[in-house]
Structures are given as structure tokens and as C-alpha cells.
């Protein structure tokens, strides 16, 4: 959980790309 929270902010900042955004959403959904 800590790793997800730690990488969450930078990923969201970079996640402007739709592809990355989709991956992040899946990862966050799985993590939470």
C-alpha cells in the first residue's frame, strides 16, 4: 500500500497520457 501511495502523486502528474492514465486507474483499483 505504501508503495502505491508514494508513487500515486507523480504518476497522476505524468498520467496526462490516456494510456498511462488507464494503467494507473487499473493499478489503483487493484491496490485499493
UniProtKB/Swiss-Prot annotation:
Keyword match Transcription: no
Cyclopeptide (Ile-Pro) cross-link, renumbered residues: 11-18
Single annotated GO MF: toxin activity
Domain of life: Eukaryota
Pfam families, sorted: Amanitin
Keyword Metal-binding: no
Function of the molecule: Toxin belonging to the bicyclic octapeptides amatoxins that acts by binding non-competitively to RNA polymerase II and greatly slowing the elongation of transcripts from target promoters.
Protein name listed in UniProt: Beta-amanitin proprotein
Name of the gene: AMA2
Amino acid at each position: 500500500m505504501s508503495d502505491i501511495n508514494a508513487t500515486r502523486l507523480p504518476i497522476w502528474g505524468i498520467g496526462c497520457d490516456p494510456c498511462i492514465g488507464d494503467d494507473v486507474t487499473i493499478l489503483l483499483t487493484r491496490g485499493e
